[in-house]
């Protein structure tokens, strides 16, 4: 596997409203654990759409990993131009920082938002251009990643395409592990 698409919930879907929320570190730790095994097996590119939440946290994880794995690259393919246009200023600044550090940035539709069709095109692009999908996603709480996860599963039924998931139970395990380590 050379290219993996990473996605997951938006912050509000997780009840997270600031990047210094303790849940963010837990999610980043889970992403790191998954990505490190893929990197050691030859992963070269992580691709995201630049969506707030899991995707931008994954970008931070990639940046941290690049210290030890300088060949690991991050690409941000936005579904449309200026997706951050209506975001709060601190979110825009955070997003622009991620874009400034990414190895490749492009827009899939190359135009501003017009319709939900642009999100479908984004999902198709990600599934076509990646070898696998990694999602912070639990089927018991579908949310925004539902459509790309469904597309990935369909591709997996007809081709050698894998979907990997970080479930809420995985995040709970990390929280308990941290509590155990801090109690010692």
Swiss-Prot record:
Superkingdom of the organism of origin: Bacteria
Protein name: UPF0398 protein BC_1561
Pfam families, A to Z: YpsA (PF06908)
The family this protein is said to belong to: Belongs to the UPF0398 family.
């Amino acid at each position: 596997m050379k290219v993996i698409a990473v996605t997951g919930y938006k912050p509000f879907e997780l009840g997270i409203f600031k990047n210094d929320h303790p849940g963010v570190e837990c999610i980043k730790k889970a992403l790191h654990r998954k990505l490190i095994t893929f990197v050691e097996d030859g992963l070269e590119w992580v691709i995201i759409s630049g969506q707030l939440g899991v995707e931008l946290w994954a970008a931070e994880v990639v940046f941290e990993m690049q210290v030890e794995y300088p060949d690991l690259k991050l690409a941000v393919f936005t579904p449309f131009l200026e997706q951050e246009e209506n975001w709060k200023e601190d979110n825009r600044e955070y997003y622009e920082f991620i874009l400034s550090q990414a190895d490749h940035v492009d827009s899939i539709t190359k135009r501003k938002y017009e319709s939900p069709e642009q999100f479908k095109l984004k999902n198709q692009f990600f599934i076509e251009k990646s070898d696998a999908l990694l999602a912070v996603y639990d089927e018991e709480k579908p949310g925004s990643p539902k459509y790309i996860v469904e597309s990935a599963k369909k591709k997996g039924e007809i081709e050698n395409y894998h979907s990997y998931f970080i479930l809420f139970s995985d995040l709970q395990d990390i929280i308990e592990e941290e509590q155990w380590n801090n109690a010692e």
